[in-house]
Amino acid sequence: MILSLLSMNINYNSITSIKQILKERKIAPRKLWGQNYLINESIRQKIIESLDIKENEKIWEIGPGLGAMTDILLKKTNLLTAFEIDLKYSEILNEKFGKLKNFKLIKGDFLKKYPNENKNIDKIFSNLPYNIASKVISKLIEENFLKEMVLTVQKELADRITAKTNSKNYSSFTVLVQSHFTAIKIIDIGENNFYPAPKVKSTTLKLIPKKNNIKDFKEFNKLIRTVFSGRRKKLKNTIINFIKNKAILEENFLKEYLGKRPENISVEEFIQISNNLNAYH
């Protein structure tokens, strides 16, 4: 593998070093874009190891920032495509890695740029900005662009993604993600492992695509959003807003669930309900 250039210029484990480069480039970390730098080397290594990069695999990195993870990834992959929205960080990334044959930088918003890129890739990696994490995951699912992903997100969101049926964190987003991925927690990360320290804990997740038998994704997504909009209500009081033919309420496939709240219905059961409802449309 090709080794990264100028890696000695930034000590990614040192707040002093990071502050220095930010000062030199007149950069102020932006909370909006999740610009918090993971300064714990052992955690960075553990996260990258969980990606389990095989020879010749192509990787996308969303939001590389100063390039701490990029530096490690480039030693493991034949092609890394990095999406960076901040032009000042893009300049730093170009200086550090721009001459490497296995590095490609895309400047701009990932959600706007990725549709135009070659999607023949194997895995996606990101320390996702907390305010857009659910949006990015939802968008990739809606577009049926399902790749193995290792993502660091706000712990609260990770708890929702990995929630079990009958738990307080079980939500429409849980059902959406778990119907398309197997979600595995890799590590919880405390605030002090970042600079600047965020106000919330983080969790790294591994999302592994899995097959499902959803017949109509749009109807499935609409169903779970509708019933979870009244999560404390029983299904009979919320699904009425989704179905057109009220006679369906008498069908056996649905009757057994009408007395349950959405948090008591499993992912597979939601898929079955959606498919059966779809047969009536």
Swiss-Prot record:
The gene is rsmA. CDD domains: AdoMet_MTases (cd02440). GO terms for molecular function: 16S rRNA (adenine(1518)-N(6)/adenine(1519)-N(6))-dimethyltransferase activity; RNA binding. InterPro entries: KsgA/Erm, rRNA_Ade_diMease-like_C, rRNA_Ade_Mease_Trfase_CS, rRNA_Ade_methylase_Trfase_N, rRNA_adenine_dimethylase, SAM-dependent_MTases_sf. It catalyses: adenosine(1518)/adenosine(1519) in 16S rRNA + 4 S-adenosyl-L-methionine = N(6)-dimethyladenosine(1518)/N(6)-dimethyladenosine(1519) in 16S rRNA + 4 S-adenosyl-L-homocysteine + 4 H(+). This is Ribosomal RNA small subunit methyltransferase A. It is found in: Cytoplasm. The keyword Nucleotide-binding does not apply. It is an enzyme of class 2 (transferase). One of its GO terms (cellular component) is cytosol. Specifically dimethylates two adjacent adenosines (A1518 and A1519) in the loop of a conserved hairpin near the 3'-end of 16S rRNA in the 30S particle. May play a critical role in biogenesis of 30S subunits. It holds the Pfam family RrnaAD. Belongs to the class I-like SAM-binding methyltransferase superfamily. rRNA adenine N(6)-methyltransferase family. RsmA subfamily. Keywords: Cytoplasm, Methyltransferase, RNA-binding, rRNA processing, S-adenosyl-L-methionine, Transferase. The keyword RNA-binding applies. S-adenosyl-L-methionine binds at N36, L38, G63, E84, D109, N127. PROSITE patterns: RRNA_A_DIMETH (PS01131), SAM_RNA_A_N6_MT (PS51689). Its EC number is 2.1.1.182.
